[in-house]
UniProtKB/Swiss-Prot annotation:
Main location: membrane
Protein name: Cytochrome P450 monooxygenase ptmJ
Cellular localisation: Membrane
UniProt record similarity statement: Belongs to the cytochrome P450 family.
Length: 515
């Protein structure tokens, strides 16, 4: 009797499961057919492009920055400048854009909303409300005091304020050199870039470069917990919150102290203080809200500094691999400033605008950014439409576009000999010139990075004050994992907010005899 009573239920269950499977198959077939005739890697009705992407990820070395697999796929299957990755139902399907005119259309002509793949990526370091505010079209316009701190003029004016931090960096490099030991340079570079941002915005130093710094480990511990892995974030959620709360308390105290110092008139008014005054005067925020907002702003500067530090590590890696470029850059430093280190520091203090004449050094930085691509930008799309630009029509069959900076920077028709480190292509008057909208490491349009001038200046200043005094020689373990040579070989990029040389870029630091 029991068996008979279960019969109808079993039949209903089987019919339901069969119906759901049939609906899933119908939906899958309908979805896969959207990509028929479109440029994609090997595509099948069962997996779409999931198999291709998974194979690339599994073939990558440990810690590899998986967004760069997109460029591997483009090369391997000879994809055009706009192609599609059908990743449904595991991941959102993506329209990969490596075409400048299409990228311009999406970001400047008809700007689309930025896609937030993981709203919790920087949580709880940044609140969801603050991230949403940052993504608004008028965010930069509503923060003129903060943006004023990111201009070339402000950076030049504040150069002398950076001297204590720069001397601390030199002292640390000397200590590492004298120790004769390998050292992962990533952490030191992160500290330097954060210091620059802190000095520019706060008017004072975080003192991160001192070996006894109390704040440096607090920041590093918070940053180490950032990442895409949801399992790790869940398992470590309590530890992540503890570290973030600790950093938050320190930054709240720092911002409050900066505001109080500005109110007292004890020192020149910093951009953070001016932003606070502006927000109170406009009525947009009360005192507590303004402090919280400015603390979140400092956290954004810290996160952006990590990405910039990754570019710094690759500058040293490429200059080591291309000694002729290193020699030419050092000669420019001698010519624009002085072969004498002491005179260089004096000129830097008296005439900081000379930094603007370091054209080849800036070209080294830009060529580095072209080669590593930084990452890319995700944009939301409306499906079942067409994107038309300059006579070309691109079907929109997925919800997300990925503007892939790396793929754009590695196109031979845009950048001749694209895998070679050739800073001369970025010199004024270079022939051929850089094609319009093809070099966009900080993106363009309303959502472009407001700190790009500060990032470029901080990297040029770093190379000026270290490259003639020290040789940083990458030292990877024998038999270390390697990626494709065009991605740095054993110095392949790993993910840490942005691309960094893997393993923290272990180096031997040598003090140059003729420095």
């Amino acid at each position: 009797m029991m068996r008979d009573s279960l019969g109808p239920f079993r039949t209903f269950t089987l019919l339901t499961v069969g119906l759901l499977l049939s609906l899933f198959v119908i939906k899958t077939v309908k979805h896969r057919r959207r990509y028929h005739g479109l440029p994609t890697p090997p595509h099948n009705m069962l997996l779409g492009n999931l198999g291709v992407v998974l194979a690339e990820i599994l073939a990558s070395p440990e810690g590899f920055f998986h967004l760069f697999c997109v460029e591997n796929i483009r090369r391997k299957y000879n994809m055009p400048s706009v192609f599609y990755l059908d990743l449904w139902p595991i991941l959102p399907s993506i329209m990969v854009v490596a075409e400048p005119v299409v990228a311009k259309h999406m970001t400047q002509v008809q700007p689309l909303q930025r896609e937030r793949f993981s709203p919790n990526l920087f949580s709880p370091l940044l609140t969801a409300e603050f991230i949403l505010a940052m993504e608004q079209k008028n965010w930069k316009k509503e923060n003129p005091a903060l943006n004023a701190a990111l201009t070339s003029t402000r950076v030049n004016e504040a150069t002398s304020l950076l001297f204590p931090s720069l001397h601390s960096l030199r002292s640390r490099l000397h200590s590492i050199s004298q120790s004769g030991k390998q050292y992962p340079i990533k952490d030191l570079l992160i500290s330097y870039i954060i210091e620059v941002g802190g000095v520019i915005q706060l008017g004072g130093s975080f003192d991160l470069l001192a070996e006894t710094s109390a704040l440096d480990p607090i920041i590093k511990q918070s940053l180490d917990m950032m990442g895409w892995n949801p399992v790790k974030r869940y398992i470590c959620s309590k530890e992540i919150k503890q570290r973030t709360d600790c950093l938050n308390r320190v930054l709240v105290a720092t911002v409050q102290n900066t505001v109080q110092t500005g109110e007292s008139g004890m020192m020149s008014q910093s951009p953070i203080y001016l932003a606070h005054v502006e927000q109170l005067a406009s009525g947009r925020m009360d005192h507590a809200e303004s402090i919280a907002y400015l603390v979140n702003t400092m956290k954004v500067i810290i996160l952006a500094s990590v990405v910039t530090a990754g570019a710094a590590s690759y500058c040293y890696l490429f200059l080591h691999k291309y000694p002729d470029c290193l020699r030419e850059m050092r000669e420019e430093h001698d010519r624009v400033f002085s072969p004498d280190r002491t005179q260089t520091w004096e000129l830097l203090q008296k005439e900081p605008h000379r930094i603007n004449s370091l054209h080849f050094t800036l070209a080294v930085v830009k060529e580095t950014l072209r080669l590593i691509g930084v990452g890319g930008v995700f944009k939301k799309l409306k499906t079942e439409e067409f994107l038309e630009t300059e006579g070309n029509v691109y079907p929109v069959v997925c919800n997300v576009a990925f503007i892939c900076h790396l793929a754009m920077g590695r196109r031979a028709d845009l950048f001749p000999d694209p895998d070679a480190f050739r800073p001369h292509r970025f010199l004024p008057g270079a022939n051929p010139p850089i094609p319009a909208d093809s070099f966009r490491p900080f993106e363009k349009g309303q959502l472009s990075c407001p700190g790009q001038t500060l990032a470029l200046k901080s990297l040029v200043l770093l190379l000026l004050t270290t490259s003639r005094e020290f040789d940083l020689v990458p030292v990877f373990p024998k038999g270390a994992p390697r990626a494709a040579e065009y991605l740095g070989g054993e110095g392949y990029p790993e993910f840490h907010i942005g691309p960094h040389v893997n393993k923290g870029m272990p180096v031997m630091v040598h003090t140059r005899v003729d420095a």
